[in-house]
C-alpha cells in the first residue's frame, strides 16, 4: 500500500478487502467514531468513497435489494481490480458484477453483523476482536485423521472488566432448511471434540446462529433442542435486533 494514502482511505479499503461488499451506510457507521456527529460522518464518508471511486479503487454497484434501507436503491461498494492489486500487490482481476443477489444478501448481512458488534462494543465499553473469513476458519482432524475445515462467517472475542466471551458466528438468512443448520451444528461439535480450540484458547467458543427474525429464531432453536446428542448449551440463537445484548450480557439460553 502506498504511504501517501489517507488513513481513512486505507481503513475503507481494508474493510472492503475483508468483507468484499458494504453499503455506504455500513461504512459510515463503522467509522462514525472518528467524527464529531452523525451528519459529519455521513458527509465525510460519502466524500471519501467518492474520491476512492474517482481514483478507480472502488466499484459502486447500484442494486435494488429488499431489506437494505427499505428496499430502495442502495450504494454497495466493493474493491475494483486496481483496489485489489493495490492491497495485495498481485495481478488478480475481479468481476464484482457477476455475484448473485443471494450472495450479496449474505455478504451484506455479515458486514452488518461486524458493524453492529463494533457499535455495541463502543456503547458498552467492551474490547472487541473480530476475525473474518478465512482467518476465522478452523482446521482439525476427524476420527480417521482426515483434515477438515470448519468455516464460520465470523469469530468474535468480547472482553469486559471481569470476563472474556468467545463466539463463532453463523449468519443465517432464512434461506436453508433447518436440517442443514443441524448438519453444521454437528460439525461444530466434531470440532469441539477435537480439542484444538481449547488447546489454543482454553475454552471452546459459544456458537451463535444469528437469524433475521423471531419466527426463524424459534424454528432453529426448536430444531437444535429436538436433535438428540447435541449439547444445547453450545449453541445460542439470536436475532440481529438482539445482537447488542450478546455483547453486553453474554450468551443467553435458548427459549
What are these regions, as identified by a protein language model?
Residues 13, 175-183, 193-255:
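Non-catalytic C-terminal interaction segments of nucleic acid-processing enzymes
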Residues 31, 49-53, 113-121, 188-196, ...:
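Hydrophobic, Leu/Ile/Phe/Ala-enriched alpha-helical segments that form helix-helix packing faces
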Residues 104-111, 115, 119, 162-198, ...:
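Core beta-strand-centered patch of the WYL/Sm-like small regulatory domain
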Residues 85-131:
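Amphipathic alpha-helical dimerization/coiled-coil segments
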Residues 61, 103, 122-167, 176-186:
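Active-site metal-binding core of divalent-cation-utilizing nuclease and nuclease-like domains
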Residues 81, 134-136, 158, 173, ...:
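Short, flexible loop/turn elements at secondary-structure junctions
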Residues 1-97:
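Nuclease-adjacent, charged terminal/linker segments that flank catalytic cores
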Amino acid at each position: 500500500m502506498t504511504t501517501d494514502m489517507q488513513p481513512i482511505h486505507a481503513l475503507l479499503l481494508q474493510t472492503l478487502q475483508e468483507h468484499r461488499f458494504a453499503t455506504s451506510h455500513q461504512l459510515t457507521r463503522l467509522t462514525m467514531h472518528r467524527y464529531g456527529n452523525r451528519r459529519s460522518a455521513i458527509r465525510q464518508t460519502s466524500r471519501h468513497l467518492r474520491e476512492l471511486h474517482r481514483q478507480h479503487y472502488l466499484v459502486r454497484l447500484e442494486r435494488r435489494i429488499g431489506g437494505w434501507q427499505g428496499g430502495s436503491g442502495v450504494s454497495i461498494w466493493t474493491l475494483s481490480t486496481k483496489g485489489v492489486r493495490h492491497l495485495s500487490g498481485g495481478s488478480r482481476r475481479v468481476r464484482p458484477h457477476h455475484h448473485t443477489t443471494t450472495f450479496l444478501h449474505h455478504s451484506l448481512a455479515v458486514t452488518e453483523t461486524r458493524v453492529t458488534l463494533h457499535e455495541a462494543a463502543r456503547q458498552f465499553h467492551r474490547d472487541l476482536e473480530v476475525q473474518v473469513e478465512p482467518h476465522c476458519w478452523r482446521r482439525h482432524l476427524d476420527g480417521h485423521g482426515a483434515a477438515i475445515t470448519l468455516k464460520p462467517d465470523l469469530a468474535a472475542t468480547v472482553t469486559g472488566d471481569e470476563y472474556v466471551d468467545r463466539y463463532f458466528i453463523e449468519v443465517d438468512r432464512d434461506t436453508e432448511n433447518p436440517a442443514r443448520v443441524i448438519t453444521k451444528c454437528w460439525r461444530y461439535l466434531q470440532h469441539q471434540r477435537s480439542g484444538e480450540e481449547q488447546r489454543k484458547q482454553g475454552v471452546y467458543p459459544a456458537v451463535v446462529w444469528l437469524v433475521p427474525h423471531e419466527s426463524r429464531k424459534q424454528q432453529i432453536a426448536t430444531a437444535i433442542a429436538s436433535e438428540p446428542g447435541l449439547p444445547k448449551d453450545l449453541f445460542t440463537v439470536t436475532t440481529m435486533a438482539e445482537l447488542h445484548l450478546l455483547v453486553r450480557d453474554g450468551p443467553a439460553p435458548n427459549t
